[in-house]
Amino acid sequence: QMRDRLAQVSDQEFQRSRVEILSGLMRLRQICDTPALFMEDYQGASGKLDSLRDLLVQVADGGHRVLIFSQFKGMLEKIEQELPDLGMTSFKITGSTPAKERQDMTKTFNQGERDAFLISLKAGGVGLNLTGADTVILVDLWWNPAVEAQAIGRAHRMGQEETVEVYRLVTRGTIEEKIQELQEQKKHLVSQVLDGTESRGSLTLAEIREILGISEAST
């Protein structure tokens, strides 16, 4: 439905509907995590959560400790609910977590307490030195190289002696694959979609069509 609309919309109409269209892009990204982030009454499965669950079983069986990043607070909450069933304990930091709590949780985690650390994008770049982990899982699209490196860097710090394994979760056949394909050829475009700066007016109609795979012939 969104593709059909954007295939026909003019630049003038796009400018009038920019907020609505960009909100639609955000919903598509949330649905890639789990439709439950967008549909409150959704009771179905999530391929990404299923894959994450399988990966976390391997992490736990291998005696590893993990940092799990997501841009969406709701996704972190879903993951947090899954961990007890896997026999895993966790800490969680979001943008609203007070600085003192962050410091206390970071210190305790690095001393060996708990198995996982859930971190939101907004909180991930602020003074976190989590050398207690040897595995990093990027749940959402993080193909802005600077942001991805920053997330991985939470575990790569002075004193980290173990190799850090990094996993990215990509939902097949979705907008995530399209953005992955565009990573090298349009890094600035990918960055705007992932860090939210598209709302500032820099993302054009043509670029959104490219993300959604709408060809010029269909416009």
Where are these regions (language model features)?
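Charged, low-complexity, helix-prone segments enriched in Lys/Glu/Asp/Gln
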Residues: 1-12, 59, 176-190
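Conserved Helicase C-terminal RecA-like lobe
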Residues: 3-128, 198-199, 205-219
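SF2 helicase/translocase ATPase core recognition
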Residues: 89, 101, 105, 109, ...
